[in-house]
């Protein structure tokens, strides 16, 4: 790549199209110095966002676009490999999800090799949050959000939390490297009104450790309120009875009650403490669902503090608690770090009994499996092949059988290119190449590559002979031996 490119695109530059009489735009030394001092990412954004008005000169637009590309890629300073890395990194950032974009930005990756090392070592920030602001999602580090350090009185008011977050965003100085990286992810927020603060949703928090048992981001608010009540006993008074309103009368009659706002629970161990959600849901009196009424300025006690006589995990709506027609709250329990969920009667939840066959007492997890198994006792084979009239217990067996007629063998071995009609046959064939023998006899510790061979072998220990000849009543251990024996009877009959 030519090393003598300048901002003015001198003789022989890429913008000198043949036969063009239009004078070239020559940048002054001051402009060149100012251009070189600017951040390359700024030129990158200017290059990608460049647009040409319809009435402008296309030649001038081409020169301007070429100049912006030169200021971004800087072929006079970078090698071909570095420019290639810049282009690949750009497409990577466009096509990858937001989590990986943050990962690249935070670590300041500049080359594909560094990016590959970063992804292999999985050097990710401890945690970040997805912020839903005015209908759009943005990513911010929790250290910048700074919600975990907010006092309980602030966390009780969602508007104060959102205004504190907005002020922390506005205080980021554009000169610092960290603030500049965050501004690439989150657009500048000039000022959030109080109404916008109420509608601000921090609806999703990502735990980048990948631990499936890690606490989820919707379980801490109620615990914080409970701790605040312990410090301030005045807050633990029960919720006053609300007067009967037309909304409650309409709820009893089965009509649509007034839409209510709720503050959902958040995880007690999640660092980003406050998650505020407004839900506008319609409910009918027949379905029996209702939401907790909660004011953004006041914390509402949980069900256990309202009435200690009520079993844990049960709650009734605020208002007329004895009304039979009024909707009730259906609590949803999720296991957390504290241990299993307690039940009203102090009894542990019992797993549903498995579905057992009434003939052979074999158990199944799903009823559909039991239904298919019962056909082996009744002899029902409802799925029939149109070509050979052979019948099968389930449709998957019929589809596999039809490959015998069509000659289809969709499963191919990667080593010897041999093809098979059944996937299980392919898996057993692959063990020939790998030497794997995963099936072990529980009696003599002998190993086998196929489960069928193990079952036949274990009959030598148990003495089982499931195949019995209907002619001579002789029993056999293996199906192949039994079929060969049946041929002897047919040959004798034919003679």
From Swiss-Prot:
This is Zinc finger and SCAN domain-containing protein 5B. A zinc finger (C2H2-type) spans 355-377, 383-405, 411-433, 439-461, 467-489. Residues 17-34, 161-173, 292-310 have a biased composition (Polar residues). The lineage of its organism: Eukaryota, Metazoa, Chordata, Craniata, Vertebrata. CDD domains: SCAN. It is found in: Nucleus. GO terms for cellular component: nucleus. Residues 44-126 form the SCAN box domain. PROSITE patterns: SCAN_BOX, ZINC_FINGER_C2H2_1, ZINC_FINGER_C2H2_2. Residues 250-262 have a biased composition (Basic and acidic residues).
